[in-house]
C-alpha cells in the first residue's frame, strides 16, 4: 500500500511545477480545472469497469477559483457546461466522469514535459489502469 501511494505521489510530482506555471499562463479555464481533476483523480479516483472515474468532490467553490486562478463566474460556467454535456455527474459527496473527459488536459500536460526514455500511457484511463490500486476507505 505504501508503494502504491509513493508511485502516485511521484506521478503527481512529475505533473506539478513547470506544467502548473504553463497552465496558469496559457490555458483556458476549462483546461486548468481539468488539469486539477487529473491530479485529484490520481490520488482519490477509482476507475470503474465502464471507464468512468469516481472520486470525492474535488474542491469548494472558493478553493476551485484559487486553484484555477479564475473568477467564480468562469469556474461556475465551466462546471455548468460539463454537467449539461453529461460529463460531470454529481452523486452526493462524489463526482463521476468519463476518463476520456480529461484526456485533453492529460495530453497537454504530457506534451509539456521533457523527453525521456520512459513512455507514459497515451490516455488518462491507461494511466489509471497502470497505477497500483489503492484501498480507499471512501468507497
What are these regions (language model features)?
Residues 1-19:
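Cyclic-nucleotide recognition modules
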Residues 40-138:
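Phosphate-/nucleic-acid-contacting segments
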Residues 8, 12, 35, 39, ...:
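Charged/polar, solvent-exposed surface patches and flexible loops
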Residues 5, 9, 28-32, 59, ...:
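Residues forming well-ordered secondary-structure scaffolds
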Residues 2-3, 22, 29, 53:
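Residue-level recognition of alpha-helical structural elements
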Amino acid at each position: 500500500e505504501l508503494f502504491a501511494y509513493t508511485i502516485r505521489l511521484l506521478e503527481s510530482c512529475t505533473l506539478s511545477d513547470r506544467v502548473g506555471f504553463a497552465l496558469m499562463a496559457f490555458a483556458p479555464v476549462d483546461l486548468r480545472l481539468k488539469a486539477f481533476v487529473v491530479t485529484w483523480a490520481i490520488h482519490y479516483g477509482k476507475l470503474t469497469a465502464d471507464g468512468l472515474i469516481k472520486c470525492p468532490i474535488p474542491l469548494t467553490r472558493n478553493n476551485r477559483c484559487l486553484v484555477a486562478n479564475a473568477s467564480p463566474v468562469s469556474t461556475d460556467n465551466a462546471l455548468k457546461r460539463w454537467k449539461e454535456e453529461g460529463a460531470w455527474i454529481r452523486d452526493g459527496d462524489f463526482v463521476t466522469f468519463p476518463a476520456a473527459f480529461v484526456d485533453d488536459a492529460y495530453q497537454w500536460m504530457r506534451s509539456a514535459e521533457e523527453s525521456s526514455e520512459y513512455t507514459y500511457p497515451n490516455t488518462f484511463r491507461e494511466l489509471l489502469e497502470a497505477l497500483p490500486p489503492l484501498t480507499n476507505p471512501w468507497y
